[in-house]
């Protein structure tokens, strides 16, 4: 588990009390401040991942405890030593290894998976030219779905997305389905 910080963004809204800022311009305060949105992420070695934005600056114990539904009891967790993780680790009775420096890294104990995930998030942010902080959790869900679908073919991806959207309700008229090409990724043999 690790956290990633991205600058707070008012993209798409015009606020008279907030001065305009050009893309790539640094934050006015140094280090972690209330201008940085915290993305808390956890990545399994087998590929499953979770990413959520909880607050500005460092996450609190309560923020990290909101992720407890995604972590199994008695699992093994590698962190960077942030003390906010301790309550979650005790509650879930997890084994814990702190990996702070390069000397702590070896073939088993490392944060490479989560750091790779963070690099992919950075690449997506650059592609979208920044994301409004208002919608950051929606984009976080998109990033995790893209990560989980990266090695699937189109049919597996479609089934995965249908399972994720199973509890949502969405209504279409027959004429919309034929004109909007909603099911274009389904091969002809399945239609």
Protein language model features and the residues they cover:
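Residue-level recognition of single "structural anchor" positions
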Residues: 1-191
């Amino acid at each position: 588990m690790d956290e990633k910080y991205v600058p707070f963004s008012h993209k798409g809204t015009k606020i008279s009390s907030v001065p305009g800022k050009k893309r790539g311009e640094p934050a006015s305060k140094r280090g972690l401040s209330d201008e940085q949105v915290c993305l808390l992420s956890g990545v399994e070695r087998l590929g499953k991942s979770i990413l959520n934005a909880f607050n500005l600056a460092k996450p609190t114990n309560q923020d990290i405890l909101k992720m407890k539904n995604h972590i199994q009891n008695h699992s093994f967790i590698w962190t960077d030593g942030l003390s906010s993780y301790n309550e979650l680790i005790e509650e879930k009775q997890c084994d814990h290894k702190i990996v702070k420096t390069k000397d702590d890294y070896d073939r088993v104990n490392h944060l490479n998976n989560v750091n790779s995930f963070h690099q992919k998030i950075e690449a997506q942010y650059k592609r979208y030219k920044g994301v409004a902080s208002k919608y950051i959790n929606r984009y976080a869900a998109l990033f995790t779905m893209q990560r989980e679908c990266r090695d699937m073919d189109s049919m597996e991806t479609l089934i995965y997305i249908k399972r994720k959207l199973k509890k949502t309700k969405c209504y279409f008229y027959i004429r919309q389905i034929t004109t909007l090409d909603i099911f274009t990724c389904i091969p002809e043999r399945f239609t």
